[in-house]
A protein has these predicted regions:
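Donor-nucleotide binding loops and adjacent catalytic segments primarily
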Residues: 195-266
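Short, basic, glycine/proline-bearing loop/turn elements
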Residues: 76-80, 157-164, 227-234
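Short gly/ser/thr-rich secondary-structure transition/capping motifs
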Residues: 86-87, 107, 168-172, 212-216
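Alpha-helix C-terminal capping/helix-to-coil transition sites in glycosyltransferase folds
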Residues: 98-100, 183, 224
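Glycosyltransferase specificity loop/lid
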Residues: 1-151, 237, 241-266
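Active-site-proximal region of nucleotide-activated glycan assembly enzymes
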Residues: 123-197, 203-204
Length: 266
């Protein structure tokens, strides 16, 4: 049996898909140690995994600052992740020497998980909660003028922060190498291959498994009907207009293809 270290960022949309994976690995007799944050402790322990709190490495935020995270730029978010990695360095050095994981399973944007896997020469498997990103992504990702400017002017700032990682044994070419998928790293992607843009450009190291939902309560389904799962991430979940459009689209689809009136009250 293997010892597996899980790493994720403090976000529901990135942590939740990893929970069924942890539960299945534990069920098969593996030891899973999940490095996460206190808000997820109960969910993680429910999988049978060991929970390790990383809250001490996050700054204390006021309610106003916490709300402001939803508007933070890509540059600021990247720099913050690099700084958290530096703050966790001594702690994770000790954890890797003590736990000695056989595999690291890290969220795709959890820098401290990926960087420590590379630093300690432990095989890495990447958990991708959205689409996988590679060189083809620029063909369908349309950045606003503000986002483009942020990337252009933010690169020197990020490069400066990356330099601070070198004395700690982290060798990083550039920021893209931290977030962009490569065809040599084993990756689990929580969408279907049909929904992944340019899926043919990804190697066999990628497994597209579809939505991953972990819950002790199964949805009530008195009738054998399809289940529609709609989910947004932590950062942009407060979007009632989006959910309303999903409901509207579903109702329109049903009435176009099915004569619901023939079934009585819907």
């Amino acid at each position: 049996m293997k010892k597996i270290a899980f790493f994720s960022i403090p976000a529901h949309g990135h942590t939740n898909p990893m929970l069924p994976v942890a539960a299945e690995l534990v069920r098969r007799g593996n030891t899973v140690r999940f490095y996460s944050f206190d808000v997820f402790e109960n969910k993680i322990r429910a999988t049978g995994a060991d929970f390790v709190s990383c809250d001490a490495f996050l700054g204390n935020l006021t309610k106003k600052e916490e709300a402001g995270l939803k508007k933070v730029s890509t540059t600021e978010m990247t720099i913050q992740d690099i700084r958290i990695t530096l703050q966790m360095d001594t702690f994770l050095d000790g954890e890797f020497k003590k736990f000695r994981p056989d595999v690291v399973y890290s969220d795709s944007v959890c820098f401290w998980g990926k960087l420590n896997a590379w630093k300690h020469h432990v095989p890495l498997v990447v958990s991708t909660s959205t689409f996988a990103f590679n060189r083809m992504s620029s063909r369908y990702l349309k950045n606003s003028l503000k986002e483009t400017a942020d990337m252009i002017f933010g690169m020197p700032k990020i490069a400066k922060e990356l330099k601070k990682l070198e004395p700690c044994g982290y060798n990083v070419k550039n920021a893209l190498s931290l977030v962009q998928s490569d065809n040599e790293t084993d990756s689990v992607v929580y969408t279907s291959k049909r929904f992944q843009p340019y899926s043919e450009s990804f190697s066999d190291h990628y497994v597209f498994v579809g939505p991953s939902v972990f819950s002790g309560t199964a949805p009530s389904k008195e009738k054998e009907r399809p289940l529609v799962y709609v989910s947004m991430g932590t950062v942009i979940n407060d979007r009632p207009d989006f959910y309303a459009k999903c409901i509207e689209a579903l109702i329109l689809y049903i009435f176009i293809y099915i004569n619901c009136r023939a079934y009585g009250t819907v």
